[in-house]
Amino acid sequence: MRSLALYEEAFRGAFRTFYGEPSHWSLYALLPNYLRRKGSSLVYMADRLIKECGSGGFYLDDYDALLRDMAADPKPKILLGVSYALWDLAERYAPKLRDTVVMETGGMKGYREEIPKEEFHRILCDAFGVEAIHSEYGMAELTSQAYSQGGNRFRCPGWMRVVCRDVNDPFELLPDGSRGGLNIIDLANWWSCAFIQTQDVGRVDDDGSFVIEGRIDHAEIRGCNLLVQ
Protein backbone atom coordinates (compact mmCIF):
# COMPACT_ATOMS: atom_id res chain seq x y z
CA MET A 1 0.00 0.00 0.00
CA ARG A 2 1.49 3.29 -1.09
CA SER A 3 -0.35 5.45 1.44
CA LEU A 4 -1.40 4.51 4.95
CA ALA A 5 -3.40 7.73 5.00
CA LEU A 6 -5.83 6.21 2.49
CA TYR A 7 -6.16 3.06 4.61
CA GLU A 8 -6.85 5.17 7.69
CA GLU A 9 -9.45 7.23 5.84
CA ALA A 10 -11.17 4.04 4.66
CA PHE A 11 -11.35 2.23 8.00
CA ARG A 12 -12.35 5.38 9.88
CA GLY A 13 -15.07 6.07 7.33
CA ALA A 14 -16.40 2.52 7.53
CA PHE A 15 -16.39 2.58 11.33
CA ARG A 16 -18.24 5.91 11.45
CA THR A 17 -20.80 4.65 8.93
CA PHE A 18 -21.95 1.90 11.30
CA TYR A 19 -20.86 2.97 14.80
CA GLY A 20 -20.54 6.75 14.78
CA GLU A 21 -17.63 8.67 16.22
CA PRO A 22 -14.89 6.52 17.79
CA SER A 23 -14.70 8.92 20.75
CA HIS A 24 -18.11 7.63 21.86
CA TRP A 25 -16.59 4.21 22.50
CA SER A 26 -13.86 2.37 24.35
CA LEU A 27 -12.26 -0.29 22.14
CA TYR A 28 -10.81 -3.43 23.72
CA ALA A 29 -8.89 -5.69 21.32
CA LEU A 30 -8.41 -9.39 22.04
CA LEU A 31 -6.15 -10.37 19.15
CA PRO A 32 -3.64 -13.07 20.19
CA ASN A 33 -1.11 -14.08 17.52
CA TYR A 34 -1.97 -11.00 15.45
CA LEU A 35 -0.05 -9.05 18.10
CA ARG A 36 2.93 -11.42 17.97
CA ARG A 37 3.93 -10.43 14.45
CA LYS A 38 4.63 -7.14 12.73
CA GLY A 39 2.67 -5.75 9.84
CA SER A 40 -0.88 -6.91 10.66
CA SER A 41 -3.37 -4.52 9.05
CA LEU A 42 -5.97 -5.53 11.66
CA VAL A 43 -3.67 -4.57 14.52
CA TYR A 44 -2.85 -1.27 12.78
CA MET A 45 -6.55 -0.48 12.38
CA ALA A 46 -7.37 -1.41 15.98
CA ASP A 47 -4.43 0.63 17.30
CA ARG A 48 -5.52 3.78 15.47
CA LEU A 49 -9.15 3.36 16.51
CA ILE A 50 -8.15 2.80 20.15
CA LYS A 51 -6.22 6.07 20.03
CA GLU A 52 -9.26 7.87 18.61
CA CYS A 53 -11.50 6.28 21.22
CA GLY A 54 -9.16 7.50 23.93
CA SER A 55 -9.73 4.40 26.06
CA GLY A 56 -9.42 0.63 25.81
CA GLY A 57 -6.34 -1.25 24.68
CA PHE A 58 -4.79 -4.51 23.48
CA TYR A 59 -4.91 -7.72 25.51
CA LEU A 60 -2.83 -10.64 24.32
CA ASP A 61 -4.20 -13.40 26.53
CA ASP A 62 -4.63 -11.67 29.90
CA TYR A 63 -8.35 -12.24 30.31
CA ASP A 64 -8.35 -11.18 33.96
CA ALA A 65 -6.95 -7.74 33.14
CA LEU A 66 -9.30 -7.39 30.19
CA LEU A 67 -12.42 -8.09 32.24
CA ARG A 68 -11.23 -5.97 35.15
CA ASP A 69 -10.59 -2.95 32.93
CA MET A 70 -13.86 -3.34 31.05
CA ALA A 71 -15.85 -3.57 34.28
CA ALA A 72 -14.31 -0.31 35.52
CA ASP A 73 -14.93 1.56 32.25
CA PRO A 74 -18.10 3.73 32.28
CA LYS A 75 -18.16 4.29 28.49
CA PRO A 76 -19.94 2.09 25.95
CA LYS A 77 -17.47 -0.57 24.88
CA ILE A 78 -16.57 -2.62 21.83
CA LEU A 79 -14.80 -5.92 22.45
CA LEU A 80 -13.08 -6.76 19.16
CA GLY A 81 -11.79 -10.30 19.26
CA VAL A 82 -10.59 -13.00 16.93
CA SER A 83 -13.23 -15.73 16.94
CA TYR A 84 -11.29 -18.48 18.72
CA ALA A 85 -10.15 -16.10 21.48
CA LEU A 86 -13.72 -14.98 22.15
CA TRP A 87 -14.74 -18.64 22.38
CA ASP A 88 -11.94 -19.28 24.89
CA LEU A 89 -13.07 -16.27 26.94
CA ALA A 90 -16.67 -17.47 26.85
CA GLU A 91 -15.76 -21.00 27.98
CA ARG A 92 -13.34 -20.04 30.72
CA TYR A 93 -15.14 -17.04 32.24
CA ALA A 94 -18.63 -16.60 30.72
CA PRO A 95 -18.60 -12.94 31.84
CA LYS A 96 -21.80 -10.93 31.59
CA LEU A 97 -20.68 -7.81 29.73
CA ARG A 98 -22.35 -4.47 30.44
CA ASP A 99 -22.83 -1.80 27.73
CA THR A 100 -20.68 -3.84 25.36
CA VAL A 101 -20.78 -4.67 21.66
CA VAL A 102 -19.02 -8.00 21.09
CA MET A 103 -17.43 -8.01 17.63
CA GLU A 104 -15.76 -11.09 16.16
CA THR A 105 -13.30 -11.20 13.32
CA GLY A 106 -10.77 -13.56 11.80
CA GLY A 107 -12.50 -16.93 12.15
CA MET A 108 -11.12 -20.02 13.88
CA LYS A 109 -7.99 -20.36 11.69
CA GLY A 110 -7.58 -23.99 12.71
CA TYR A 111 -7.33 -23.23 16.43
CA ARG A 112 -10.86 -24.38 17.25
CA GLU A 113 -13.47 -26.62 15.72
CA GLU A 114 -15.41 -25.02 12.89
CA ILE A 115 -19.11 -24.92 13.75
CA PRO A 116 -22.06 -23.16 12.06
CA LYS A 117 -21.91 -19.41 12.59
CA GLU A 118 -25.39 -19.31 14.12
CA GLU A 119 -24.37 -21.88 16.74
CA PHE A 120 -21.13 -20.05 17.49
CA HIS A 121 -22.92 -16.73 17.95
CA ARG A 122 -25.49 -18.39 20.22
CA ILE A 123 -22.66 -19.71 22.42
CA LEU A 124 -21.17 -16.22 22.70
CA CYS A 125 -24.53 -14.52 23.31
CA ASP A 126 -25.36 -16.94 26.13
CA ALA A 127 -21.93 -16.57 27.73
CA PHE A 128 -21.65 -12.79 27.48
CA GLY A 129 -25.30 -11.91 28.08
CA VAL A 130 -25.67 -9.94 24.84
CA GLU A 131 -28.47 -10.05 22.27
CA ALA A 132 -26.33 -10.21 19.12
CA ILE A 133 -22.76 -10.70 17.97
CA HIS A 134 -21.34 -8.12 15.59
CA SER A 135 -18.67 -9.02 13.04
CA GLU A 136 -15.96 -7.26 11.05
CA TYR A 137 -15.13 -8.59 7.59
CA GLY A 138 -11.84 -7.64 6.00
CA MET A 139 -8.65 -9.12 4.63
CA ALA A 140 -5.10 -8.11 3.75
CA GLU A 141 -6.08 -7.68 0.09
CA LEU A 142 -8.76 -5.10 0.96
CA THR A 143 -8.45 -1.53 2.18
CA SER A 144 -12.05 -1.41 3.43
CA GLN A 145 -14.16 -3.44 5.85
CA ALA A 146 -17.78 -4.57 5.98
CA TYR A 147 -19.66 -4.90 9.27
CA SER A 148 -22.46 -7.08 10.58
CA GLN A 149 -24.49 -5.77 13.50
CA GLY A 150 -26.12 -9.13 14.08
CA GLY A 151 -27.49 -12.10 12.20
CA ASN A 152 -24.29 -12.57 10.16
CA ARG A 153 -25.61 -10.03 7.63
CA PHE A 154 -22.86 -7.70 6.47
CA ARG A 155 -23.18 -4.24 5.00
CA CYS A 156 -20.53 -2.28 3.12
CA PRO A 157 -19.54 1.38 3.14
CA GLY A 158 -20.53 3.30 0.02
CA TRP A 159 -17.28 2.67 -1.87
CA MET A 160 -17.36 -1.12 -1.44
CA ARG A 161 -19.63 -3.71 -3.08
CA VAL A 162 -19.98 -7.50 -2.99
CA VAL A 163 -21.30 -9.63 -5.87
CA CYS A 164 -21.89 -13.37 -6.18
CA ARG A 165 -20.33 -15.67 -8.80
CA ASP A 166 -20.75 -19.26 -9.90
CA VAL A 167 -18.10 -21.30 -8.05
CA ASN A 168 -17.53 -23.42 -11.17
CA ASP A 169 -17.36 -20.50 -13.63
CA PRO A 170 -15.58 -17.39 -12.34
CA PHE A 171 -16.89 -15.30 -15.25
CA GLU A 172 -20.58 -15.90 -14.46
CA LEU A 173 -22.13 -13.49 -11.99
CA LEU A 174 -25.27 -14.69 -10.24
CA PRO A 175 -28.51 -12.77 -9.61
CA ASP A 176 -29.37 -11.37 -6.19
CA GLY A 177 -30.36 -14.03 -3.69
CA SER A 178 -28.21 -16.75 -5.26
CA ARG A 179 -25.61 -18.73 -3.34
CA GLY A 180 -22.07 -18.72 -4.68
CA GLY A 181 -18.54 -17.42 -4.33
CA LEU A 182 -18.13 -13.83 -3.18
CA ASN A 183 -16.34 -11.20 -5.28
CA ILE A 184 -15.51 -7.84 -3.74
CA ILE A 185 -15.14 -4.45 -5.37
CA ASP A 186 -13.18 -2.07 -3.12
CA LEU A 187 -12.62 1.35 -4.65
CA ALA A 188 -10.27 2.23 -1.79
CA ASN A 189 -7.76 -0.21 -3.32
CA TRP A 190 -6.43 2.81 -5.18
CA TRP A 191 -2.92 1.53 -5.94
CA SER A 192 -3.76 -2.16 -6.14
CA CYS A 193 -6.44 -4.39 -7.64
CA ALA A 194 -9.94 -3.15 -6.72
CA PHE A 195 -11.59 -6.42 -7.80
CA ILE A 196 -11.01 -9.38 -5.48
CA GLN A 197 -12.26 -12.94 -5.94
CA THR A 198 -12.50 -14.64 -2.55
CA GLN A 199 -12.95 -18.28 -1.59
CA ASP A 200 -15.81 -17.39 0.73
CA VAL A 201 -19.28 -18.71 -0.07
CA GLY A 202 -22.42 -16.75 0.64
CA ARG A 203 -25.43 -14.87 -0.64
CA VAL A 204 -25.87 -11.26 -1.76
CA ASP A 205 -29.35 -9.72 -1.50
CA ASP A 206 -30.90 -6.92 -3.52
CA ASP A 207 -30.20 -4.28 -0.86
CA GLY A 208 -26.45 -4.92 -1.19
CA SER A 209 -26.10 -6.75 2.11
CA PHE A 210 -24.51 -10.17 2.13
CA VAL A 211 -24.33 -13.30 4.26
CA ILE A 212 -21.23 -15.50 4.59
CA GLU A 213 -22.05 -19.20 4.73
CA GLY A 214 -18.56 -20.70 4.74
CA ARG A 215 -15.62 -21.45 2.48
CA ILE A 216 -15.36 -23.20 -0.87
CA ASP A 217 -14.46 -26.87 -0.39
CA HIS A 218 -10.71 -27.41 0.06
CA ALA A 219 -10.01 -23.67 0.18
CA GLU A 220 -6.82 -22.69 1.98
CA ILE A 221 -6.96 -21.50 5.57
CA ARG A 222 -6.38 -17.75 5.56
CA GLY A 223 -5.08 -15.37 8.20
CA CYS A 224 -1.93 -13.33 8.77
CA ASN A 225 -1.83 -14.62 12.36
CA LEU A 226 -0.96 -18.06 10.98
CA LEU A 227 2.47 -16.77 9.99
CA VAL A 228 3.63 -17.19 13.60
CA GLN A 229 3.25 -20.96 13.35
Each language-model region and where it sits:
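Conserved aromatic-histidine-acidic binding/catalytic patches
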Residues: 3, 30, 34, 112
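Conserved AMP-binding loop of ANL adenylate-forming enzymes
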Residues: 11-46
